[in-house]
From Swiss-Prot:
<keyword id="KW-0479">Metal-binding</keyword>
<keyword id="KW-0378">Hydrolase</keyword>
<keyword id="KW-0233">DNA recombination</keyword>
<feature type="binding site">
    <location>
        <position position="67"/>
    </location>
    <ligand>
        <name>Mg(2+) 2</name>
    </ligand>
</feature>
<feature type="active site">
    <location>
        <position position="67"/>
    </location>
</feature>
<comment type="similarity">
    <text>Belongs to the RuvC family.</text>
</comment>
<feature type="active site">
    <location>
        <position position="7"/>
    </location>
</feature>
<keyword id="KW-0227">DNA damage</keyword>
<comment type="subunit">
    <text>Homodimer which binds Holliday junction (HJ) DNA. The HJ becomes 2-fold symmetrical on binding to RuvC with unstacked arms; it has a different conformation from HJ DNA in complex with RuvA. In the full resolvosome a probable DNA-RuvA(4)-RuvB(12)-RuvC(2) complex forms which resolves the HJ.</text>
</comment>
<dbReference type="GO" id="GO:0048476">
    <property type="term" value="C:Holliday junction resolvase complex"/>
</dbReference>
<dbReference type="GO" id="GO:0006310">
    <property type="term" value="P:DNA recombination"/>
</dbReference>
<protein>
    <recommendedName>
        <fullName>Crossover junction endodeoxyribonuclease RuvC</fullName>
        <ecNumber>3.1.21.10</ecNumber>
    </recommendedName>
</protein>
<keyword id="KW-0460">Magnesium</keyword>
<dbReference type="GO" id="GO:0008821">
    <property type="term" value="F:crossover junction DNA endonuclease activity"/>
</dbReference>
<keyword id="KW-0963">Cytoplasm</keyword>
<dbReference type="InterPro" id="IPR020563">
    <property type="entry name" value="X-over_junc_endoDNase_Mg_BS"/>
</dbReference>
<dbReference type="InterPro" id="IPR002176">
    <property type="entry name" value="X-over_junc_endoDNase_RuvC"/>
</dbReference>
Length: 162
């Protein structure tokens, strides 16, 4: 089963494709970044959706896991992120019919055992769980991988119908 993990953002969107095999574990297939240029909001959203579309067309994706919007102090930032999330949700629903959402707290808890972990602790566990060497940059990619791992753990524990 291939899981697409997505860390949506208005400037960069991290994505990761994780192959989940219940017997052999997880293997990272691909991870990358969709960079969004400074343009009008409408063009940024279009560029974002086109980037996701390209990933979906180039890979056989079975399930999608998305990191939920975190709390931001700036209401304009929340509104902008919500617009990106709405476009992403529509695209995934049109192509696959369903997706799963995980809060940053759920992701941190799934990978490190507690919800107060910092980004470096999450990055360490991502590398350890997948047997990766070197640093994964930027953190948007690490977060996308972490979301995909969280989803695979939920499947393994029987918490999600497949």
């Amino acid at each position: 089963m291939n899981i697409l993990g997505i860390d949506p953002g208005s400037r960069n969107c991290g994505y990761a494709i994780l192959h989940h095999d219940p017997k052999k574990g997880n293997r990272l297939v691909e991870a990358g970044l969709i960079k969004i240029k400074e343009r009008t909001l409408q063009h940024q959203i279009l560029e974002f959706v086109e980037g996701i579309d390209l990933v979906l067309k180039n890979h056989s994706i079975d399930e999608v896991a998305i990191e939920d919007i975190f709390y931001a102090y700036n209401p304009k930032t929340v509104i902008k992120l919500a617009q990106f999330r709405g476009a992403l949700s529509l695209k995934i629903l049109q192509d696959l019919g369903n997706f799963y959402e995980y809060t940053p707290l759920q992701v941190k808890k799934a990978l490190t055992g507690h919800g107060k972990a910092d980004k470096s602790q999450v990055a360490f566990m991502v590398k350890r769980l997948l047997g990766l060497k070197g640093e994964i940059k930027p953190l948007d990619i690490t977060d996308a991988i972490a979301v995909a791992i969280t989803h695979s753990q939920r499947i393994k524990l029987g918490g999600i119908p497949t």
